[in-house]
């Protein structure tokens, strides 16, 4: 405490008097050699700063702890990471505000019923559209997410939201995955998703269309969660000048950061890409209802070449 006050410019004698400490005792304390525990904490604080920078300033203490213990094999506790971050003035971005939504009216079959958990790839894909303004006008992004690995497997960006936008995102996912028949593609009741061309694209790939309740975002909560993360970690962090600038940033966020570097709490802090690879290679072990661990080496978070902001 006194050290921090003195470093901030406060007189030593004033700090000692206010805190009831003798100046002689304080100076004896200052002359003591730094303990091994304190040296380790300083070292960990430096690593925490590097990880926080590499995450574009988005990681809180849980993901930083995962990066230290899983990515770097450094044993430490969640609490220690939280304490060191607080002392160093490092913090993650605040989470989304949870809003209770009113129940809407169902107008089409919902094959998911808010049960998004899947243990195999390509059993369930969820898709949706988000928008964000630039000085040139809005940018619309459609994405397709695999419910098992949380990986974005298809996406498309345009200056208008129409059926072509969502079909392009779905087409990218189908070409990348070549799914077996019987998988489900789940969306909301936007006109782009209920259009003939989109539902026909689903059926022609041997997949089944599914639509949540009208007006209830919880029926597509997994996709809403991804959009919320992207809003907090990318879109809302600056004012975007051009559509090209924002398009490039979304591309980097999805393909470089989210899929390959960002650790996901529901995947036991694996990245979607690593979890996807492990599922494909069938190197997972399942224990009861607990989500299985990834049996491949984790990708270590590296410093970004281009910051988002």
Question: Model-flagged regions — what are they?
Answer:
Residues 16, 23-121, 216, 271-281:
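Basic, flexible linker segments flanking DNA-binding modules
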């Amino acid at each position: 405490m006194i050290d921090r006050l003195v470093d901030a410019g406060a007189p030593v004698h004033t700090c000692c008097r206010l805190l009831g400490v003798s100046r002689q005792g304080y100076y004896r304390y200052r002359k003591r050699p730094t303990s091994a525990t304190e040296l380790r904490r300083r070292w960990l604080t430096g690593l925490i700063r590097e990880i926080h920078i590499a995450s574009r300033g988005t990681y809180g203490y849980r993901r930083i702890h995962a990066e230290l213990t899983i990515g770097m094999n450094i044993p430490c506790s969640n609490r220690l990471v939280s304490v060191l971050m607080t002392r160093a003035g490092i913090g993650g971005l605040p989470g989304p505000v949870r809003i209770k939504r009113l129940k809407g009216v169902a107008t089409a079959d919902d094959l998911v019923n808010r049960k998004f958990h899947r243990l195999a790839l390509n059993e369930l894909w969820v898709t949706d559209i988000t928008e964000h303004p630039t000085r040139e006008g809005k940018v619309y992004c459609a994405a397709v997410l695999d419910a098992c690995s949380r990986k974005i497997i298809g996406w498309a960006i345009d200056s208008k939201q129409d059926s072509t936008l969502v079909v392009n995102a779905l087409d990218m996912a189908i070409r990348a995955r070549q799914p077996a028949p019987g998988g489900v593609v789940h969306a909301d009741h936007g006109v782009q998703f209920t259009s003939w061309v989109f539902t026909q694209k689903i059926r022609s790939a041997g997949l089944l269309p599914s639509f949540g309740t009208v007006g209830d975002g919880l029926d597509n909560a997994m996709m809403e969660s991804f959009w919320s993360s992207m809003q907090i970690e990318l879109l809302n962090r600056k004012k975007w000048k051009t559509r090209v600038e924002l398009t490039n940033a979304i591309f980097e966020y999805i393909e470089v950061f989210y899929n390959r570097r960002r650790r996901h709490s529901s995947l036991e802090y694996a990245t979607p890409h690593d979890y996807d690879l492990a599922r494909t290679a069938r190197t997972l072990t399942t224990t009861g209802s607990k989500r299985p661990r990834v049996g491949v080496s984790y990708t270590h978070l590296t410093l970004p070449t281009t910051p988002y902001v």
